[in-house]
Amino acid sequence: MSLSRLIINNFRNLTAVDLELNHGFNFFIGANGSGKTSLLEAIFYLGHGKSFKSHISNRIIKYNQEEFTLFGKIQEEKHECSVGLQKNRQGETILRINGESNKKIADLAYLLPMQVITPEGLTLLNGGPIYRRAFLDWGLFHQNTDFYHNWNSLKRLLKQRNAALVQTRHYNELKPWDVELSKFAQIVSQSRAVYVESILTYIEKNCQFFLPELEITATFYQGWEKERDYADLLAQGFERDRSVGYTMVGPQKADFRFRANGLPVEDVLSRGQLKLLMCALRLAQGEYFIAQKNRQCIFLIDDFASELDTQKCELLADRLYQSGSQVFVTAITQEQLKPIQGKRQDNATSFFIKDGKMQFM
């Protein structure tokens, strides 16, 4: 699976872009502010219906324009699929897959599985648990066909319970929600635990490859004490939850924590080491997806050389080539891409970008 064509209109400073893409490596070279990151952001938006940089769509639509439009052609073996997304300043979104509307963001996400490595992506390690839950849930969305339904049911029940907490005086009034909530909490948490066990081998292999000098360990916390019954905890914590206005334990508090030589990675690793660990995790998840689903995973890598020396850049390049995936890479100069461009030239295309305009190199 690869993105064979990409059309972008009025997305940030990208007024009109129409690219034929390489199924292997696509390099984008240009100065800061030229539109390199915006191009990766547009690809991400096409596959997720949201940005990895801003939650406010009006900031993404080009100045003095009313909407942005994204279109892509996906090639998978002998089949081709077209996807399109349009967003206006009123927040309305139109999705089309093969010309058919009334599609969901989940349909796009299924068609375009992708991993993103950006300077801001260190939040996977030094940010809040929400980023690590998203990491696990991405994997489960693509791995487990029932997970998306179970996860949405859990979110809906949590929202209803939190709203009911404000109006409820006695726990018996809340119990019907808790019976259902407990069921889906157990399902989601068990799914996450199984996924963690399955992907750990891939994580350990990549950590050894990128950070052999460190012992990296990972621990999954489900959001409440493992030996406790979740339904009992909900009942016992009713007064506390009612006083704060939300449910304080459960899968919405889950975390996937990492330690280096026994200490939290965010406390002891340098930014360069954190980036290498982030790369190890993203590659591990992509490689596990490829192995399980027999499909490619797109990798988006912004500012390839930042925080990494030449040797580490070459290590990252090696793993990306070995994955057999479609890769989009940005850099400020051609020099920064030498460690990755020097590996193979027969499966790569380079573009120069300036003021939102692309030029084939």
UniProtKB/Swiss-Prot annotation:
<keyword id="KW-0238">DNA-binding</keyword>
<dbReference type="GO" id="GO:0005737">
    <property type="term" value="C:cytoplasm"/>
</dbReference>
<dbReference type="InterPro" id="IPR003395">
    <property type="entry name" value="RecF/RecN/SMC_N"/>
</dbReference>
<dbReference type="GO" id="GO:0006260">
    <property type="term" value="P:DNA replication"/>
</dbReference>
<dbReference type="InterPro" id="IPR001238">
    <property type="entry name" value="DNA-binding_RecF"/>
</dbReference>
<dbReference type="GO" id="GO:0009432">
    <property type="term" value="P:SOS response"/>
</dbReference>
<keyword id="KW-0234">DNA repair</keyword>
<dbReference type="GO" id="GO:0005524">
    <property type="term" value="F:ATP binding"/>
</dbReference>
<keyword id="KW-0963">Cytoplasm</keyword>
<dbReference type="GO" id="GO:0000731">
    <property type="term" value="P:DNA synthesis involved in DNA repair"/>
</dbReference>
<dbReference type="GO" id="GO:0003697">
    <property type="term" value="F:single-stranded DNA binding"/>
</dbReference>
<dbReference type="GO" id="GO:0006302">
    <property type="term" value="P:double-strand break repair"/>
</dbReference>
<keyword id="KW-0742">SOS response</keyword>
<comment type="function">
    <text>The RecF protein is involved in DNA metabolism; it is required for DNA replication and normal SOS inducibility. RecF binds preferentially to single-stranded, linear DNA. It also seems to bind ATP.</text>
</comment>
<keyword id="KW-0227">DNA damage</keyword>
<dbReference type="InterPro" id="IPR042174">
    <property type="entry name" value="RecF_2"/>
</dbReference>
<keyword id="KW-0547">Nucleotide-binding</keyword>
<keyword id="KW-0067">ATP-binding</keyword>
<dbReference type="InterPro" id="IPR027417">
    <property type="entry name" value="P-loop_NTPase"/>
</dbReference>
<keyword id="KW-0235">DNA replication</keyword>
<dbReference type="Pfam" id="PF02463">
    <property type="entry name" value="SMC_N"/>
</dbReference>
<protein>
    <recommendedName>
        <fullName>DNA replication and repair protein RecF</fullName>
    </recommendedName>
</protein>
<comment type="similarity">
    <text>Belongs to the RecF family.</text>
</comment>
<feature type="binding site">
    <location>
        <begin position="30"/>
        <end position="37"/>
    </location>
    <ligand>
        <name>ATP</name>
    </ligand>
</feature>
<dbReference type="InterPro" id="IPR018078">
    <property type="entry name" value="DNA-binding_RecF_CS"/>
</dbReference>
